[in-house]
Amino acid sequence: MSEPFKSGFVAIVGRPNVGKSTLLNHIIGQKIAIMSDKAQTTRNKVQGVFTTDESQIIFIDTPGIHKPKHKLGDFMVKIALNTFQEVDLIYFVIDASTGFGRGDEFIIEKLKNVQTPVFLLINKIDLISPEDLIKLIEQYRELMDFEEIIPISALEGNNVPNLLEQTNANLEIGPMYYPKDQITDHPERFIISELIREQVLQLTREEVPHSVAVVIEGIEKNPKTEKLTINATIIVERSTQKGIIIGKQGQMLKQIGMRARKEIESLLGSKVFLEIWVKVQKNWRDKEHYLHDYGFDREEY
């Protein structure tokens, strides 16, 4: 007789830039959580759905937990903390190459108050020696009683199959929440805006920080050619940032558009014409009605 089907929700938490989105994208096999080496790139709870014949795991990729500096930061931390209560299992991801940080202390204090089992995932193990890894495991073991401690490399995929096996062992018997071929419950508009935002963050580096939102104004399909026309607006806080994003003779914006278009085409599997505008909206991160307009939901505060 075949084993009963299992399912459950898993939250991925950790300091900014420890590789949470990389891990989610490796497991799902498609780019659904924005990846960039800047802190604070994941803003909304992106759900990735991983389904096999035996089980379905719904992943929730939370924003990096950090002490908030403004309303947007406050919002992001609140989402992450609320998530702990809603899931069946928590992956707490740390970066082996940077070791124990003050941010980890902040997260561990929060995790200690939660009933949910926690897996400690030591990521980027390819960057440290086995001796240092053992020391790190011992250091974290003293801080908290983890359900499992699993060293991985999210980028290379090392030990990820073992992680999924341990995850399945911790799931309860449950239904298939999403159709088998569905990998995320985020509408396509949201993922398209995230792919554009990823390119802005990657290409402009520190010059344009997190004061960037992307709004998809419209998506139209040409019935004859099947080609999609997507109109998007990049929102920044200062006109100097607008200048940086547009670049000399529009070169930077052209680069952003070209790279984002390739990502969007591979996501949607169809040809895309992408038109991007840049707009200045002063201090949008501190104005609630703008946060709502740009996809941040008040109910999650």
Curated annotation (Swiss-Prot):
Q: Where is this region: G5?
A: 152-154
User: Where does this chain mainly localize?
Assistant: cytoplasm
User: Could you tell me which residue ranges the KH type-2 domain spans?
Assistant: 204-282
Q: Which Pfam families match?
A: KH_2 (PF07650), MMR_HSR1 (PF01926)
Q: Which residue ranges are recorded for the region named G3?
A: 61-64
| All residue ranges annotated as the Era-type G domain in the record | 6-173
Q: GO annotations under biological process?
A: ribosomal small subunit assembly
Positions binding GTP in this chain are 14-21, 61-65, 123-126
Q: Where in or outside the cell is it found?
A: Cytoplasm; Cell membrane
List keywords of the entry alphabetically.
Cell membrane, Cytoplasm, GTP-binding, Membrane, Nucleotide-binding, Ribosome biogenesis, RNA-binding, rRNA-binding
Which Gene Ontology terms of cellular component type are present?
cytosol; plasma membrane
Oligomeric and partner information? Monomer.
Q: What does this protein do?
A: An essential GTPase that binds both GDP and GTP, with rapid nucleotide exchange. Plays a role in 16S rRNA processing and 30S ribosomal subunit biogenesis and possibly also in cell cycle regulation and energy metabolism.
Per the record, the similarity remark reads:
Belongs to the TRAFAC class TrmE-Era-EngA-EngB-Septin-like GTPase superfamily. Era GTPase family.
Q: What is this protein called?
A: GTPase Era
Originating species:
Listeria innocua serovar 6a (strain ATCC BAA-680 / CLIP 11262)
